[in-house]
């Protein structure tokens, strides 16, 4: 193991290398290492034409020069294979603008690919992605036109009469990893990391590909200064270590200090978690929480689903269920926004690949995920809007393999203004963007799969609740205060089935104070 400085990155990483970058959105970004690559390119033009691969791309949901945004320089990246690009918006925009070929791959597949590469396997063979945009019969994971012009990344195969997808392995030349400590030998530990993601499999994948493993740490401990059980990456896998400056060794972009309640080293009272004001997000969170049952294992997606965690904390039912995040934590209360991926008071934190092993096998009782577009068939899009590419993240793995799926979001978008008063929903200004459309732009969730798998599917908004039936969406509830024709049916590009038993949403959802929710 050799200790390096940021300025050394340009000499270690070569033009055309495939570079795997760890991190989970706002958490665990190897910020100083990424900046070293960017700085070298700006100064010398090298390294260039890199193939970069990541799960949830490091970033803070802005155009700031952080995370993957630092790599959004023309000529630096030649290809990208990522699961989610929404956190690093500038980098995602370069893909939408067709600057270089890119593939948007399910997060569970990316993590399992690192494991397959480490084991010198042909790839990942799975049902995950069938009948979605990942399926080569649809778009084959292509995130832009340049990708469509190249050899397919994923292949449809049939084994014993079953259609499966083969996501093909590729060698990794460099792994870029953030950790907490290294010892003098190069053993690596992750005590301060809220997410133990893909780092271990990524390191072995690079090492077994004949590549290099570079780790950013807070501090180098003396020899034998780490407990063996705390070491997740052995020194034999590590080529270089960089000790980061304090301002680039963040837990995440919004939480610059170590948060022991996110690593299991401390518990805090859940009443310390801020209670949401009574708004449309809270309405959606409360209505979704009403579907929970005691003992459920539940995944919450990024964005509005974090309102469900708030609702559970406010109602005092957080300990009656197990909230799970695809990045690895289970138990406690998941954090939303930039810090998504970590949880407060988690019961366990496991590597992301192992979390997806459980998810793919059906361990989740329910998931609550975002709703950006839904169409008359019940398909959902959360991964592409115009030329803006976000990618699926863990959405496909989760929604395809969970017994009960709830999509949650406002009914329209784009300037929507609403008020909740006197137990009713008042629409002040309608959104300019319809979410319930004739055909979604990209299929991230396949209603065809759901019907074949007998999954229970709900679409929860602040003014209406739908369920998936064999031929499309059925409207089953509307909010008090809204007009069925003007506020719901006229705001859709198709006509749903309207249940003969259509009823009002529970009035408690629209009132101040606790609901008194019991599960």
Regions found by a protein language model. Give the residues of each.
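Nucleotide donor/acceptor-binding cores
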Residues: 17, 46-50, 78, 295-296
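Hydrophobic/aromatic residues located in beta-strands of well-ordered beta-sheets
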Residues: 50-52, 213, 298, 323, ...
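Glycine-rich phosphate/diphosphate-binding loops and the adjacent beta-loop-alpha structural elements
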Residues: 187, 267-280, 287-299, 304, ...
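Conserved phosphate- and dinucleotide-binding cores of soluble alpha/beta proteins
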Residues: 2-11, 25-41, 56-72, 76-269, ...
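Short glycine-rich or small-residue beta-strand-to-loop segments that form or flank ligand, phosphate
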Residues: 18-23, 51-55
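Glycine-rich phosphate/diphosphate-binding loops that line cofactor/substrate pockets in enzymes
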Residues: 5-18, 170, 283, 287-297
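Conserved S-adenosyl-L-methionine
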Residues: 39-48, 74-77, 315-321
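Glycine-rich phosphate/ribose-binding loops and adjacent secondary-structure elements
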Residues: 48, 274-277, 282, 286-293, ...
């Amino acid at each position: 193991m050799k200790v390096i400085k940021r300025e050394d990155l340009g000499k270690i990483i070569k033009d055309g290398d495939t570079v795997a970058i760890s991190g989970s959105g706002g958490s665990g970004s190897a910020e100083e290492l990424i900046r070293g690559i960017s700085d070298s390119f700006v100064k010398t033009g090298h390294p260039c034409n890199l193939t970069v691969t990541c799960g949830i791309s490091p970033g803070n949901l802005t155009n700031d020069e952080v995370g993957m945004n630092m790599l959004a320089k023309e000529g630096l990246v030649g290809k990208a294979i990522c699961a989610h690009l929404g956190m690093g918006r500038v980098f995602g925009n370069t893909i939408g603008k067709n600057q270089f070929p890119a593939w948007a791959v399910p997060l569970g597949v990316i993590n399992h690919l690192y494991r397959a590469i480490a084991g010198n396997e042909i790839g990942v063979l799975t049902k995950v992605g069938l009948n979605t945009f990942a399926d080569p019969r649809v778009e084959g994971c292509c995130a832009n036109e340049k990708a469509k012009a190249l050899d397919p990344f994923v292949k449809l195969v049939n084994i014993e009469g079953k259609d499966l997808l083969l996501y093909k392995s590729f060698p990794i030349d460099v792994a870029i990893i953030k950790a907490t400590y290294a010892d003098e030998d190069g053993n690596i530990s992750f005590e301060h990391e809220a997410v133990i993601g893909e780092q271990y499999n990524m390191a072995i994948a690079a090492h077994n590909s004949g590549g290099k493993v570079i780790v950013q740490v807070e501090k180098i401990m003396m020899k034998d200064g780490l407990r063996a059980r705390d070491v997740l990456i052995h020194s034999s896998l590590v080529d270089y270590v960089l000790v980061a400056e304090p301002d680039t060794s963040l837990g995440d972009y919004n939480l610059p200090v170590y948060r022991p309640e996110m690593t299991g080293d401390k518990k805090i009272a859940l009443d310390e978690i801020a209670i949401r004001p009574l708004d449309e997000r809270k309405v959606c969170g409360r209505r979704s929480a009403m579907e929970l049952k005691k003992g459920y294992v539940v995944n919450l997606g990024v964005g509005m689903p974090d309102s469900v965690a708030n609702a559970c904390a406010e109602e005092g039912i957080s300990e009656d269920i197990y909230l799970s995040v695809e990045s690895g934590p289970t138990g406690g209360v998941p954090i939303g926004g930039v810090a998504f991926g970590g949880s407060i008071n988690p019961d366990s934190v496991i590597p992301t690949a192992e979390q997806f092993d459980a998810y793919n096998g059906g361990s989740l009782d329910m998931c609550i995920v975002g709703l950006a577009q839904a169409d008359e068939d019940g398909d959902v899009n959360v991964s592409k809007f115009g030329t803006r590419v976000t990618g699926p993240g863990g959405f496909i793995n989760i929604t395809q393999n969970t017994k009960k799926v709830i999509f949650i979001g406002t009914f329209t978008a784009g300037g929507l203004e609403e008020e909740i008063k006197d137990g009713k929903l008042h629409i002040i200004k309608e959104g300019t963007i319809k979410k319930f459309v004739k055909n979604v732009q990209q299929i991230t969730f396949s209603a065809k799969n759901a019907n074949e798998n007998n999954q229970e599917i709900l679409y929860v908004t602040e003014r209406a609740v739908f369920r998936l039936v064999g031929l499309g969406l059925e409207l089953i509830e509307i909010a008090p205060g809204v007009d069925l024709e003007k506020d719901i049916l006229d705001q859709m590009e198709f006509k749903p089935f309207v249940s003969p038993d259509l009823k009002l949403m529970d009035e408690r959802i629209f009132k101040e104070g606790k609901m008194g929710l019991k599960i």
